[in-house]
């Protein structure tokens, strides 16, 4: 299955800001998080605390990812 993966803020240090990703065997947000943590163990904590959106809707870990989705990884941020 192919998706568009968008990375923001500190996650851009580990992943390209935008990439097409082939993710066979991945069905849920939690599956994707685990896959990305295995790819970049040094980003594991940041991925764990990040929110995920699918087609601009915030998703839960149990939500399904479908072919052609745009998935964004949104790390926590702070500001003033």
Regions found by a protein language model. Name each.
Residues 1-78:
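Ubiquitin-like/PB1-type beta-grasp interaction modules and other compact soluble beta-rich domains
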């Amino acid at each position: 299955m192919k998706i568009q993966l968008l990375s923001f803020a500190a996650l851009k240090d580990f992943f390209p800001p935008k990439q097409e990703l082939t993710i066979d065997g991945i069905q849920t947000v939690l599956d994707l998080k685990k896959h990305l943590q295995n790819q970049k163990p040094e980003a594991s904590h940041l991925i764990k605390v990040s929110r995920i959106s699918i087609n601009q809707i915030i998703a839960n870990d149990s939500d399904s990812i479908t072919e052609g989705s745009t998935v964004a990884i949104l790390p926590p941020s702070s500001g003033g």
